Every structure is written in structure tokens, then in C-alpha cells.
Amino acid sequence: MIKVVYVTGCFGFIGSYVTRACLEKGWYVRGIDKCTYASNEDLLFEFTEKYGDRFTFEREDINDLQFLYDCDYVINTAAETHVGNSIVSSKEFVKSNVDGVHNLLELIKNHRGENTEKPVLIHFSTDEVYGDIESGDHTEKDILKPSNPYSATKAAADMLVMAWGRTHKVPYMIIRPTNNYGVGQYVEKLIPKSVKYLRIGKKIPLHNNGMPLRNWLHAADTAEAVMTIIEKGSVGEIYNVAGGFEQRNIDTVEAIVKSYFKGNQKPTEEYIDFSIGRPGQDIRYALDDSKLRSLGWKPTKVFIEEVEAIVEYYKYKFIW
């Protein structure tokens, strides 16, 4: 069945993959993006050229959005996401990640009228809301223990969503993915930043000696997870999404270095600046996503097979 959806943050990394997945299904998408430094506005041409009038765009901050057209889903990927920036200055994170979500909830609450089932809010959260875990995996029922300003704002937004669901009967589903990777990510994130530093001949800054463990999930698999919960998920539920591939950050950088130099590299440590620390650094994130997998979803992308294409993209095609 053809659906009409809003995607906030449609020109962001994950938002663009979600937008593309919706359009590929033949759905109508109204994209919302305030076009920050991390947005890729070139996507407007791609979406309109390839999908025609099934994609419409509104340049707007979700805090300032005052009206919703009739739709089936509001998929909220709009957010400030870079942990380092949140540590330096948290104001924009509170504004986008908390106040912006509050405005969306109010819009949905007031828009629904007698139609109590639509639109459904699909809210993007993060694995970071749980805090770190030395062993085992976090389930959706675990308490939230965010460790930095970014994850604290995302946890606060989750609480707002659940409260509006209970008090105002706003239908919602929350999705909590692990670290995403793929072509199109802004250069402040580990993988594209590593390529950038190799390209300009600078050492790659790596926190805590590169020992923190991260679970990697391709953005295309994340977008497919959204499609799965739309088609088979239940309103009022939270869904963890994990890539099933875990490794230390230093191992991720080593894979990038090997791909960049095609095997002709010096020892990986010679390309890394280990002097950088990060306050509140989480040692390990890990999620149990059996709930989502029971709906038939599973990741299809293999990290090591994707690295070469990603490195080549950032090496030659990305405008720094």
C-alpha cells in the first residue's frame, strides 16, 4: 500500500537513506531539513530528478514547524549527533534533540483530531542512551544511563515520546541503532574523518588509545529496519537495531588505513594521534536486537566488504 511520510533530517546521513528507502517503495515523502553544516543539499537534485513529485521538500527547523499535512508516518531523524560538539556546547543539542521533538509531538497530538491512529511517529534514538556495558547486550527494557550531553538529550527525547504516547495517545515507535556507517556521512565521524586525515597527511585523532568497542551497522540496513517496523512493528514499542559486528576503534582505523594505501602502508600506529581523550567516553555499546529480528529483519551489509568503497568515495568524491 502506498504511504505518505514525513522524514525530518532528510538531507542528513541516516535521514537520506531512510528517504531513499521510502521513495524506492513508491511512497510519497515530504522532506524536512534545516540544512545545517552536516546536511547534503545535493540530495535535493537526486530525489527530485529520480522520484519526481513523490518527493517534496521544506527547508525548516523542526522547532519552527507549525503544520503537518495528512500523512501516515513522521520519521524523525533530525538531530545534532556529534558527541564532541555536545561536550563543547550543548545548547543546540537541547534545542534540536529535545525541544524539536517536543514540537513534533505537539504537532502530531493536535493534528490527529478524531483519527487516533495516524500519523505514527517513528523516532530515532541511539544505543548511547543506555550507556556503556562491559559484557552482554542491552535490551529495550534496560534503564537509560547516558554518559554525555548528546546521549542525555536523546534519552530525554525518548522520555517525551513515551510520555506523549501514554498521556496524549500519540502513536509512536522508537528505534535505537548502533554506530552507523556508509557513503554520505559527514567528515566529523570516525570513518570519513580518518580518510580525510590520511588524505591531508595528518595523524588521525583517536580517543582512549582506540580501545572502545563499537558495533557497526550500515545505514542501508538501518533504513530497512525502519521499513520492517512500519510493515510489521507494533505501536508503543522500542526496537534496538544492531549490526552484529563489533570491533575496537583502532581496528576500524586499521581497516581504513589498509584500504587507503592498498596494503602499502606503514604500521597503523604511525598514522594515529593517541594523545586525544574524551570526557565521559563509553567503553562499549552493545544491543540485543532479537525483538526486531523476530519480525524478519537482519543486516545484509558486511563491514569489511563495504570499507573499500567507502574509502574510495571519501578519497576522491567528497568535497571537504
Kindly label every feature range from the protein language model.
Residues M1-N180, A309, Y316:
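N-terminal Rossmann-like NAD(P)+-binding domain of SDR-like oxidoreductases, especially those catalyzing
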Residues E24, T56, L198-W320:
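C-terminal substrate-binding subdomain of Rossmann-fold SDR/epimerase-dehydratase oxidoreductases
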Residues N63, V88, S96-D99, N148, ...:
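Residue-level signal for the nucleotide or nucleotide-sugar donor/cofactor binding architecture
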Residues K91, V195, R214:
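Short alpha-helical segment that forms part of, or immediately flanks, the ligand-binding pocket
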Residues D132-E134, V183-Q185, K189, K291:
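Short beta-loop-alpha junction of Rossmann-like oxidoreductase domains
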Residues G136, V187-V195, I256:
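A glycine/serine/threonine-rich, flexible loop-to-helix segment
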Residues A156, L160, W164, S194, ...:
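Hydrophobic alpha-helix immediately C-terminal to the catalytic Tyr-X-X-X-Lys motif of short-chain
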